[in-house]
Amino acid sequence: MAKTINISDAEWEVMHVLWSASAAMSASQVIDALAGRKSWSPRTVKTLLNRLATKGALGFEAIGKTYWYRPRVARDACAKREGRSFLARVFGGDGGAMLVHFVKNTPLTPREVAELKRILDGKEKRP
């Protein structure tokens, strides 16, 4: 992602719907997909779609009276940027402190613990 795009919490909800889709979606389809999760009016969803398009996070194409929206930024790129922002804001950029906090305060399955150990062992072996 060449340009930094700041996405609000509400906009993340819309982006998750579009990232999960296999093709472009109309505003009505996005509204329907969010209906089970959010009690937003159609106008609110359309406002969020317009904001995301203005920011460059979404592309759209008008076919007749219908606008079809698709992501222009990858989920991973947005998640990476948001993760860096969270790390800086909450933990002052200290990744180790963040990891310790989450490991101590998050229930983990034995499989997740094993995966964390594997990752940390790999970090120790690097110069």
Enumerate the predicted regions with their spans.
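Glycine-centered, phosphate/nucleic-acid-interacting loop/turn motifs that mediate DNA/RNA or nucleotide
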Residues: 56
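Short helix-coil junctions and helix-kink-helix linkers
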Residues: 32-40
